[in-house]
Design a protein with these regions (language model features):
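Short, charged N-terminal beta->alpha structural module
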Residues: 13-43
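Short, structured active-site "lid" loops
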Residues: 61-84
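Glycine-rich phosphate/pyrophosphate-binding loop and the adjoining helix
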Residues: 141-153
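Structural signal for conserved beta-strand scaffold positions within catalytic alpha/beta enzyme cores
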Residues: 20, 52, 92-95
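Gly/Ser/Thr-rich loops at beta-strand to alpha-helix junctions
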Residues: 23-29, 74-76, 98-101
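A short, well-structured beta->alpha microelement
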Residues: 42-60
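Ser/Thr/Gly-rich flexible loops in soluble cytosolic domains mediating phosphotransfer, phosphorylation
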Residues: 89-141
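Short, Lys/Arg-enriched N-terminal segments with co-localized hydrophobic residues
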Residues: 1-15
Length: 153
């Protein structure tokens, strides 16, 4: 594979450049269109950039990204790929229920938290504690909100 992903060293509070990847580009393009509309409506479009790509072309992206978020249907492709190919940028598997929520705040919060976790352990894909069994993940809110809700129970 051609390694052409540009990595933007993300710092907390910075703008966030996100690449959302799916198998054929269809569901990622729908998600990105919806999220970009939410960014525009909330006034955050100048602060964050979200784009999409097909799984097989994610290495050819020219924009510098802080994080790559993989749609749930790419899970099996990720398992078959050489994970050592991507070491310098966090790869985050979007939980299935979070993926269908189409809510920008949830995606941005998970993006920030995944970047922060990746900086501490440099493991790809990024899984939050207790979510390593990816296909069993039923979370539909951001991980930080999920954690807060568990504390309040």
């Amino acid at each position: 594979m051609n390694k052409m992903i540009w990595y933007d060293e993300h710092k907390d509070g910075d703008d966030m450049n996100i690449l959302i990847v799916c198998n054929n580009g269809c569901s990622s393009s729908v998600l990105v269109k919806r999220l970009n509309n939410e960014l525009m409506a909330s006034g955050l479009s100048k602060k964050h950039y979200i784009d999409h790509a097909q799984f097989m072309f994610m290495y050819q992206q020219k924009q510098p990204y802080d994080i790559i978020m993989l749609c749930p249907q790419t899970y099996h492709e990720w398992l078959m790929m050489k994970k050592d190919d991507i070491k310098d940028i966090p790869i985050y598997m979007i939980p299935p229920k979070l993926f269908v929520s189409f809510v920008i705040e949830k995606m941005l919060e998970d993006g920030e938290d995944a970047i922060h976790q990746f900086k501490s352990d440099h493991k790809n894909p990024v899984f939050f504690p207790g979510e390593e069994a990816y296909m069993k993940n039923r979370r539909s809110v951001s991980y930080r909100k999920f954690k807060e809700n568990k504390k309040n129970i």
